[in-house]
Amino acid sequence: MDGPSTPGSRPPDYSLPSYDDHDDSPPPGHHQNINPAAIRLLTSVEGDPYDARPYVPRSPDKPSSPEHTVKPSTPSDADLYPEPLALKKDAKSTCATPEHLDALKRQEAGRVPPSPAPIDAQTAPSTHHSYQELPKPKLKPARASTVKLQKKSHSQPNLPRCAGVRASLPVIPEGPSARKSALQKSSTSCLSTPQTCPNKENSGSQSDISSAQPTQRRSYQPSIMSDYSRHDTILDPPAMPPPDSTYVPFQGRERRTPSPTRSSPTRPWSRMSNDYTRPPPSTMYEPSDLNGSPRPGTPSSRYGGSPRRPLPPAPLFSNSARDSQASFADDVTVSIPLDHDPDDVFGPETDISDNRYRKNSYVSQDTLHDDREDDYVHDDNEENDQQGHYGPAPDGKQERRGVRAPQMSRKEVQLINGELVLECKIPTILYSFLPRRDEVEFTHMRYTAVTCDPDDFVDRGYKLRQTIGRTARETELFICVTMYNETEIDFTRTMHAVMKNVAHFCSRKKSRTWGELGWQKIVVCIVSDGREKIHPRTLDALAAMGVYQDGIAKNFVNQKAVQAHVYEYTTQVSLDADLKFKGAEKGIVPCQMIFCLKEKNQRKLNSHRWFFNAFGKSLNPNVCILLDVGTRPGGDSLYHLWKAFDNDSNVAGACGEIKAMKGKFGRNLLNPLVASQNFEYKMSNILDKPLESVFGYITVLPGALSAYRYHALQNDETGHGPLSQYFKGETLHGQHADVFTANMYLAEDRILCWELVAKRDERWVLKYVKGCHGETDVPDSVPEFISQRRRWLNGAFFAAVYSLVHFKQVWTTDHTLARKILLNIESFYQLLQLLFTYFSLANFYLTFYFVAGGLADPKVDPFGNNAGFWIFTVLRYTCALLIATQFILSLGNRPQGANRLYLASMIIFVIIMMYTSFATIWIVIYQFSNDNIHLGSNVFTNIIVSVLSTLGLYVFMSLMYLEPWHLITSFVQYYLLLPFSICTLQVYAFCNTHDVTWGTKGDNVMKTDLGGAIGKRGGTTVELEIPSEQLDIDSGYDEALRNLRDRVEVHSPPPSESQLQEDYYRSVRTYMGRDLDGCQCHPRHGRQRSLFEHRHW
């Protein structure tokens, strides 16, 4: 737009005048602040380029004649400091001719000396020759008016009047002025004898001023110049930071030795200082921190945003001396310092006349490396000695530099339907990189303080965003993610997988239900059980996604205790398991999220009551999916789960395949506990779930990955139904909460499955979806594994008893006769399985007794010398004593307090199982080496057929499913840990049927740490403390990001002294009981009868 420009066609620091037809001068008092981000709007430019002729540099040893100086026609700031070589166009100005260009070239070469012509008062002094010597130029057509951002005057130029004004100006004398002569003389003297030049510490007199290049004469020089009233010139040298500065200047240019006749161009903002002091941070730019990163901003930042937002890097040769006075007015003349500063040039101990704006020459920069450098270092050492030591470092946690603590202010807020509902702006950084900002759901987070029971959520008038305003939508899929105290890694693993599944729904373009806007039909609800139990880093992850903001929640509203804090936001970013942001560039689509943070810890069943009875009743979804934090569903698992309901209208519930998380390259399988659970999960998904799906009744839909049809869960007109039975265990208190019911509701998902299938006058079935799979983290330590299985075994046992007792309900349903018969067959199968589980401990001991005792026979003894008999005798008494020890441990010790005892028991059981397996293999080999093999043989039937019917079934079904890898990686671990699972887990579960508490004691006290909303004006408004401004919201967001980036660990509180002492006393009691029991055992003398002697057993 400015026309072609070639290197060297313009002088350094040359800038075109404003795009206008007239001379624009700002109004009085207008700040001409140099803004690097300023934008000039230009719509049309006609005519030749403004700066058409090339720039010819002048000879530095010859001062320019006064005829060459152009004076502006309007008194403004530019009059005080005219721009070098910036020519103003006028209506009568002449253009450059070939003759004129030739004369300039000859003048540069020294062939033709300059011959200034006399100045006529009626002609514009804009050329080097008189108007009569040049040919008459060809007039150009008038330019069209340009559009600009500043307001301009519409008056046309009056050329005769301008000529009269120029005629009234005083005649400029020829030759250099006295001030310029002094400058040149000072520069010459410093170059000739640098040692004799004055060298003051903070000198600001004109004697120190030297210039490497002559400039135009200034008509006015103020006594004290403010930073904003001064225009930059080419005389400003580049700033050289002191050695202790962390900002490294630009090194791209070739640094040359300055001379009076040659000087490298500088930046218009460059300033320099001879002081070895760190410049104060500016409001616009700040130097890098100790790590080389941009220093966070301050509240006085020009961005007005977060104090932790990184500012842009400083410009080339930047210095903060100019910006240090930004708080003063533009027309300031004398600044009154608030505190005494020895470096303040306007301080009380300095003379104002000697501290004008300094322009140091290049010579002063070069002398930094000569003999005077020692003087500087000596002065700095003396100054440090005078100041003394700063003292010892402060103790304790220090406030991070540049951080602005969030400030709270009391504000009066209008209540909505008598309840506290706030619309909070999202942090500025999060808003800056959002792809969509067109709706309030993207720009504001909605907070609701719920003060009622979840069953009364809708009746009390609470609303969700999906039911009000422009965001009112139909919900097809409602996803529940329950959480307790899981870490941010577990949360982000699950949440990122859910958001990828939402993106998969939107990618199905041909679907009649889904498509590009499919995310509007999906709502994700996160329910956290207990505000004081949630992991702080998990809150930081939610805050990073924009769902949560600290400082908004309150404990009570109008003297009513808050039961749950509900946050609503449609996020467009996700955090993966590595805590890295993923957005639209990775295929992430918007996701409607509801975060329900319960005030009290009331167990998982209460979380589901909030999900179904509060939020589900408000949204009325079609399908509800239940997930646990830590479970990672596959990329399209949720779609396959939803598709099962879409294909069959009789499906009331469905589940997918749960896999144990094996880690990278399967390294988690090196832990025997993880490997055994992996084999157990795989065989359950291969044998149990498909068989139960054929019958139509799956005994348990795992809460880690399952789905239900919301319509099928509803109660009938009398209030009886699946949900009423499901939440019955939460409302049982006192004498009504019997032990049987309390343990049964430890596995409440089993009760829900039975109530769905046996619902009166309905024909609902449950289905297993093979295409849906999810990975979950399994316990990897013995105490955690025992505690988890205690709830599972007790819940499964009592729920199976419940379904067997109420099996007659099947005949009241609307199922077909064939389906009813199949359900009764399945009930009989469950009865057999229940009996086998109940007597599994005796079955294990009998198996060990007869199989391992088979090696006690001298005919089969592989060791000889009757060694098999003695080995079996030792293991027999060890096994009996170990089983008795499990009862003592289960009745008196916690798994966390008796970790060593349980670990020792597991090792001994593994040894016993290894010897039993060896005995089995040896007996099978011995039988095949004998010719008397027939099917009626007791040994052949009891050993070989039983082994083939169990292990062979595992191998055959795994090969049929084309998934045999768990047989290779996990079968051995599972087989060896079978005695530990049968004896230890089974005994501990039945010995702790009284333990049905979830640690909710003392949660009935209302907390006041968050503050409250106090009612005003008859209860229509409340007064509460909230963040005072946007900067406080940004500070909390930056704090959350820093915690996630630094991976700040949250240490769990150690066990109390009383708990440790109690565990110690219980361990001593267990040792005494074990020793007493062992001392009463006496071995029976005599030869052990082997299995081969019991021919008719």
From Swiss-Prot:
Pfam families noted in UniProt: Chitin_synth_1, Chitin_synth_1N
Keywords: Cell membrane, Glycoprotein, Glycosyltransferase, Membrane, Transferase, Transmembrane, Transmembrane helix, Virulence
Gene Ontology, cellular component aspect: cell septum; cellular bud neck; plasma membrane
Similarity remark: Belongs to the chitin synthase family. Class II subfamily.
Ranges of compositional bias, category Polar residues: 183-226, 317-327
Topological relation to the membrane, as annotated: Multi-pass membrane protein
Name under which the protein is recorded: Chitin synthase 2
